Amino acid sequence: MSFSVTLPDGSKKDFDKAVSVKELASSIATSLGKAAVGAKINGEMKPLDYVVDEDVEAAIITDKDEEGLNILRATAAFLLEAIAKRKYPELRLGMHEADEGGFFVDTDKEDQIKITELPELEKEMQKAIKNGEKIEYTSMKKSELEDIFKDDQFKLDLLKDEKDEVAVYKLGDFVDFGFEALLPNTGKIKNFKLLSVAGAYWLGKSSNPMLQRIFGTAFFKKAALDEDLKRRAEIKERDHRTIGRDLDLFFVDPKVGAGLPYWMPKGATIRRVVERYIVDKEVADGYEHVYTPVLMNVDAYKTSGHWAHYRDDMFPPMDMGDGEMLELRPMNCPSHIQIYKHHIRSYRELPIRIAELGMMHRYEKSGALSGLQRVREMTLNDGHTFVALDQIREEFAKVLKLIMDVYKDFDITDYYFRLSYRDPKNTDKYYANDEMWEKSQSMLKAAMDDLGLDYVEAEGEAAFYGPKLDIQTKTALGNDETMSTIQLDFMLPERFGLTYVGQDGEEHRPVMIHRGIVGTMERFIAYLTEIYKGAFPTWLAPVQAEIIPVNEEAHGAYADKVREELAKRGFRAEVDHRNEKLGYKIRESQTQKVPYTLVLGDDEMNANGVNVRRYGTEEQISKSLDDFIAEIDADVKSYSREK
């Protein structure tokens, strides 16, 4: 027997007998053998015990590699499965996964595992880690595994996709499959943490049973684990779902509709302020705001191309019984096209700018839904401008300036520009017109170059009908998210037969510019909630001033008078008339992150004044009511976020 192993640098190692991945790594360098945790053999992940006995390409994976971390986390998931099965013999196991975020294991148990039980599971896992229990890598016939798991429908479902020979791992009597590569023993899983539990439908389908998903993470070094746990704590503190619950901004009840948020009065106030701001900004910039129906004949979406390219993200059409099929709109473009088409248009009218806070519906699977960020019903800050060919660059610059002005008011500074093109290797998902794509992509690029702005280019990120400029922001949780878009569209004007009468008296085809300034209200307010950590700047805060009388009987009426004076001037204030201690009320006002807390006692009432405490400070300052009104008025007009 003789064979060669080709390494990543192109060099080869020759062998005259079979070698394990561990032995292969050691033959390259002793230090590599010690650091190795697995290998990629012909592109597939394999464990250290995997035997090589033929010509292959091999890349050794160490604990410094991202793939190495995934191997560690997969091993932690496997150990969690084994320990959970020892502790709860009746438990059934579903899917498992390890990636850059950590790992998870799906379980099915009549009495669900409580989050308070995770420390006990961790303790049992630590015992196995301390003992360095051996994890055996082998293979078994698919039929053998079907016999072992004959009473476990979850495992039988997973086995359907396996080949006749299945790689399996054993820890004592425990056996499982579906792992690419695991460590040969439990000894290296020292730095891990079980994080949380949540529900997950089997195979991601809402028609299947709901299982319990246990999340965890693991690192080779304790310092890395500590840093990750610190980051997760910060994320939890900023999570808009947590803040939304604590501040009573919104809720979602799966019993009445997953992905359909209910806006509570405070959350609705924030949304209303943002919507009014956006509408005023757009009207001042030359947009005409409209209202259009959320239902549309399905034929419009066949004409637009949504039916062919976007159907999987649309709800099923409604048969009205008379041949009419109505569809909940997934996008507003066809609606604004109808506004344009309602009149004969002249070149003198161009650009025609149409905007709407348009409600849309998109078919999202339940597993993808998340708070306000991924919902099934959303309101998009949408706009479409119809221009002549020679107006594109000027209008593009105008839209971009509007976006930058809005970013300045919300203090959005962490962003970059991305030109999103179609994927030339997968053109089936895009409108088929090579000339149009080349023309629109080059025009978009030229417009950015004219403005002297830096940008990255990304293939495969375009809309199906045209390229776009995406403005990518970093959320408070560190995720990359598209906040704003500007898209050039030559396709829809052609498909809907849009025209305008030119200076020559002939009909011409307009170009359509799609643009979204802040995306959907739902996602934007989720973004703001996390960026501000719930401490909204005064102009956005649902309650701008909390008024607390020291003694209800003595000062309650004066507190109401102060609220009325503030309300007359357009400020949002509440009076806390509850029969609670003063200190408790002040603390709760701070917990609710109200910008101003006004405490009113004898001195304040006699002087027609207020005692003011800003959120996040201990300092209390007495001043006249007029002075406070001037202060809060200047604060609201500043449109600035507290640094």
UniProtKB/Swiss-Prot annotation:
Its cofactor is Zn(2+). CDD domains: TGS_ThrRS, ThrRS_anticodon, ThrRS_core. Coiled coil: none annotated. This is Threonine--tRNA ligase. Keywords: Aminoacyl-tRNA synthetase, ATP-binding, Cytoplasm, Ligase, Metal-binding, Nucleotide-binding, Protein biosynthesis, RNA-binding, tRNA-binding, Zinc. Residues 1-62 form the TGS domain. The lineage of its organism: Bacteria, Bacillati, Bacillota, Bacilli, Lactobacillales. Pfam families: HGTP_anticodon (PF03129), TGS (PF02824), tRNA-synt_2b (PF00587), tRNA_SAD (PF07973). SUPFAM superfamilies: Class II aaRS ABD-related, Class II aaRS and biotin synthetases, TGS-like, ThrRS/AlaRS common domain. Binds 1 zinc ion per subunit. Belongs to the class-II aminoacyl-tRNA synthetase family. Gene3D superfamilies: 3.10.20.30, Anticodon-binding domain (3.40.50.800), Bira Bifunctional Protein, Domain 2 (3.30.930.10), Threonyl-trna Synthetase, Chain A, domain 2 (3.30.980.10). Homodimer. It is an enzyme of class 6 (ligase). It catalyses: tRNA(Thr) + L-threonine + ATP = L-threonyl-tRNA(Thr) + AMP + diphosphate + H(+). GO terms for molecular function: ATP binding; catalytic activity, acting on a protein; metal ion binding; threonine-tRNA ligase activity; transferase activity; tRNA binding. PROSITE patterns: AA_TRNA_LIGASE_II, TGS. Zn(2+) binds at C333, H384, H514. InterPro entries: aa-tRNA-synt_IIb, aa-tRNA-synth_II, aa-tRNA-synth_II/BPL/LPL, Anticodon-bd, Anticodon-bd_dom_sf, Beta-grasp_dom_sf, TGS, TGS-like. Its main location: cytoplasm.
